[in-house]
């Protein structure tokens, strides 16, 4: 009985540790993702040009650029 309880406790602890590791952000970058150089500025994302099909134009509310 004692051995069974110990196994259950170990199983629960390992599940809790795995869930905590999954939820917390990783301190180390994943090897599959390329890391930007330290001196490199972040890329500037330009808004997509918006093509209005219906009125009122949704571009006015979202702040996109009209063509």
UniProtKB/Swiss-Prot annotation:
Taxonomy, superkingdom: Eukaryota
Annotated segments matching region Disordered: 22-44
Signal sequence segment? 1-25
Processing and modification events after translation: Disulfide bonds are important for activity especially against Gram-negative bacteria, since the linearization of the peptide causes a strong decrease of activity on these bacteria.
Choose any GO biological process term that the UniProt entry carries and state it. defense response to bacterium
Q: Does the entry annotate any disulfide bonds, and if so which pairs?
A: 50-59, 52-57
Residue ranges the record marks as coiled coil: none
Q: Which UniProt keywords apply?
A: Antibiotic, Antimicrobial, Disulfide bond, Immunity, Signal
The residue ranges flagged as biased composition, category Pro residues, are 31-44
Give a brief account of the tissues where this protein occurs.
Mainly expressed in hemocytes. No or very low expression in heart, gills, inestines, and epidermis.
Could you tell me what this protein does? Antimicrobial peptide that has a large activity spectrum with activity against Gram-positive, Gram-negative bacteria, as well as against fungi. Shows activity at micromolar concentrations. Displays minimal inhibitory concentration (MIC) values lower than minimal bactericidal concentrations (MBC). May have a dual mode of action depending on the peptide concentrations. At MIC concentrations, the peptide penetrates into the cytoplasm of target cells (tested on the Gram-negative E.coli). The two inner membrane proteins YgdD and SbmA may be required for this uptake.
Q: How does it assemble?
A: Interacts with chitin through the N-terminal region (26-48). This interaction may be important, since chitin is a component of the fungal cell wall, as well as of the crab exoskeleton (permitting a possible action of arasin in wound healing in case of lesions).
Q: Name it.
A: Arasin 2
Q: Which organism is it from?
A: Hyas araneus (Atlantic lyre crab)
| Taxonomic placement | Eukaryota, Metazoa, Ecdysozoa, Arthropoda, Crustacea
């Amino acid at each position: 009985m004692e051995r069974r309880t110990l196994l259950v406790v170990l199983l629960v602890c390992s599940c809790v540790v795995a869930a905590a590791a999954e939820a917390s952000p990783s301190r180390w970058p994943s090897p599959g993702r390329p890391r930007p150089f330290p001196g490199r500025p972040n890329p500037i994302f330009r808004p997509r040009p918006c093509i209005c099909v219906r009125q009122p134009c949704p571009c006015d509310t979202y702040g996109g650029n009209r063509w």
